[in-house]
Amino acid sequence: MIKLIVGLGNPGAEYAATRHNAGFWLVDQLARMGNVTLRNETRFHGYAARANLWGNEVWLLQPQTFMNRSGLATVALARFYKVMPDEILVVHDELDLPPGTVKLKLGGGSGGHNGLKDIAAHLTTQQFWRLRLGIGHPRNLLPPGTAASGQHDVANFVLKAPRKEEQDLIDRAIDQSLDALPELIAGNAEKAMMRLHTAH
């Protein structure tokens, strides 16, 4: 059962449309569906709201600490409302999946994602759920002849807006996620994975 959904991203208008903010986009959709407004909650270092989604009360959170401090906000809200790590779903951009692909998993490493790394450090466990929204990798998406091998290029890539065709695919993956989330929130993880991983 999921009691807290954390969308990862960076605060500020200049980052709103960037690939690294894909987690924010999904949480924005959930807030609209739940007819709630995310409000600045200083004690939780982010924008938060309690929503009734598919008959379940769920907290929505967008940390406003910048990506590499996401754990601060996540743990502040989780501790206050006594949410266990395996009741948390973190929604984040995933370089290792192409745009349009979305995967759900419990636990595992951070895959170089600083937001996940910080959340795991603050929770002192990696046993929380992750919804991985594919944004692609610069080596696969940039035009031929464009250098995109170093860490610097990846950092630039995630802080830029997707091209239109990529954005359309990411939006479709978010829609697929919304189809599977009722099962996960209700505690039917296997059904949620089946629905998500067999969606076309």
From Swiss-Prot:
Listed SUPFAM superfamilies: Peptidyl-tRNA hydrolase-like
Listed EC numbers: 3.1.1.29
InterPro entries, A to Z: Pept_tRNA_hydro (IPR001328), Pept_tRNA_hydro_CS (IPR018171), Pept_tRNA_hydro_sf (IPR036416)
Subcellular location: Cytoplasm
Positions annotated to bind tRNA: 15, 66, 68, 114
Pfam families linked: Pept_tRNA_hydro
Keywords: Cytoplasm, Hydrolase, RNA-binding, tRNA-binding
Gene Ontology molecular functions: peptidyl-tRNA hydrolase activity; tRNA binding
Entry GO terms, CC: cytoplasm
Catalytic center residues: 20 (proton acceptor)
Keyword ATP-binding recorded: no
Family in the record: Belongs to the PTH family.
Designated name of the protein: Peptidyl-tRNA hydrolase
Organism of this sequence: Ralstonia pickettii (strain 12J)
Lineage, uppermost ranks: Bacteria, Pseudomonadati, Pseudomonadota, Betaproteobacteria, Burkholderiales
